[in-house]
A protein has these predicted regions:
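DUTPase catalytic domain/fold
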Residues: 1-139
């Protein structure tokens, strides 16, 4: 599958998978961006995509970034969207964090998408039922 990428800025980098079998393609910071402490910030990539029909783009964190206390606020890119890919982050730290120009900031995963219609009705019972939020214990 090929995905068309438009550079909105000359210095933008196209997404790159580090290894042929990696699920995610790295997204890069268009410019140096300082994330203030304990705040949400947006980081530009300088690219737009043309995702194939029946797919979506999911923006996920990179462990090399998130282990530094910088949390990607996961995003969903609909196939018809043609605007710039901008990644939102939350800096969990008490100090600012700087992304350098060209630094890997997040991962883009392209997934098949279903378009269900939601209808009201009774739902079947399962063994799990309503268990959630750690209901099975930690060990």
């Amino acid at each position: 599958m090929q995905i068309k990428v438009k550079k909105l800025e000359k210095e933008a980098k196209l997404p790159v998978r580090a290894h042929a079998t990696d699920s995610g393609a790295d997204l890069f910071a268009l410019q140096e961006t300082v994330l203030p402490a304990r705040q949400i910030s947006k980081v530009r990539t300088g690219i737009a995509l043309e995702l194939p029909e029946n797919t979506s783009g999911c923006v996920w964190g990179k462990s090399s970034v998130e282990t530094k206390g910088i949390k990607v606020m996961a995003g969903l890119i609909d196939a018809p969207y043609r605007g710039e890919i901008i990644v939102c982050f939350y800096n969990l730290n008490d100090t600012p964090f700087t992304f350098e120009k060209g630094q890997k900031i997040a991962q883009l995963v392209v997934l098949p998408t279903l378009y269900p219609t939601f209808v009201e009705g009774e739902i079947s019972q399962t063994e799990r039922a309503q268990g959630g939020f750690g209901s099975t214990g930690s060990k």
